A protein has these predicted regions:
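Conserved micro-motifs of the catalytic ATP-binding
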Residues: 82-87, 128-131
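Short helix-loop "hinge" at the ATP-lid/N-box region of the Bergerat-fold HATPase_c
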Residues: 146-148
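Acidic ATP/Mg2+-coordinating residue in the GHKL
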Residues: 174
Length: 236
């Protein structure tokens, strides 16, 4: 009916306005944040400064990098939720793709705080996936970062890929404290949970999986730790 169509148009306009507003705020914040990061790096590396001052500058840089990641996650999850993020899918061999993404992470400073292993079954090595490579990289980065940031170093991280029941399965597990019960309840709830903990990075993981026609399952590792399993459709 005309009334229902008009209602849907209003909802679409509201969602678009929200996405545009978040994108605008994210853009405006990035410029001063880039300056803060740049100055902090300069001060951190300035040999003329006393060690305590350089250490504080390093702290400012680290916290600024966290803030930048949060802004990126907020912008991305908003676009994914409201269909404003175009997927640039390409056909990839899963084995080389996962190795490439893991190698990229190993080049980051956070990788020094973990013991990372990768295991891929022969079927997973040969599997074909139709994915947006940067988004899948973001998904894996968020999972690994979450394990490292919420556990004492060095945390042991294992990535395993396999083909199960006609789907590609990627599991990321750690030996840390595990997801708090409130976080698991919020992540696995079918509807948004009231007063849910702030888990933006993990929501991005969930949204990226859904955008690819897959799903992310968050749970507990054995005997302890966090475990997330990503299920993606195979491209045949």
């Amino acid at each position: 009916s005309a009334h229902l169509q008009r209602k849907n148009e209003i909802i679409a306009q509201r969602d678009n306005a929200r996405t545009q507003w978040i994108a605008g705020v994210s853009h405006d914040v990035r410029t001063p944040l880039a300056l803060i990061l740049g100055w902090a790096e300069q001060l951190e590396q300035d040999k003329a400064l006393p060690a305590p001052a350089r250490q504080k500058a390093g702290g400012i840089r680290t916290q600024s990098e966290k803030l930048r990641a949060l802004i990126d996650d907020l912008n991305l999850t908003s676009k994914l939720q409201y269909g404003a993020q175009p997927l640039r899918k390409e056909l990839c061999a899963a084995g080389p793709l996962v190795r490439e993404l893991v190698a990229q992470f190993c080049d980051s400073p956070l990788a020094e705080r973990c013991d990372l292993s990768l295991t891929q079954t022969p079927a997973a090595e040969q599997a074909k996936l139709s994915v947006d490579r940067p988004l899948l990289g973001r998904l894996l980065e968020n999972l690994l970062n979450n394990s490292i940031r919420h556990n004492e170093a060095p945390v042991r991280l294992g990535i395993r890929t396999e083909v199960v029941g006609g789907s590609f399965c990627l599991t990321v597990a750690d030996d840390g404290a595990g997801y708090p019960p409130a976080v698991l309840a919020a992540l696995n709830a079918p509807e948004p949970v009231e007063n849910a903990p702030h888990i933006l990075g993990l929501h991005v993981v969930d949204n990226i999986a859904s955008a690819h026609g897959g799903r992310a399952v968050f749970g507990k590792n054995t005997p302890h730790g966090a475990k997330t399993t990503l299920w993606l459709p195979l491209d045949t």
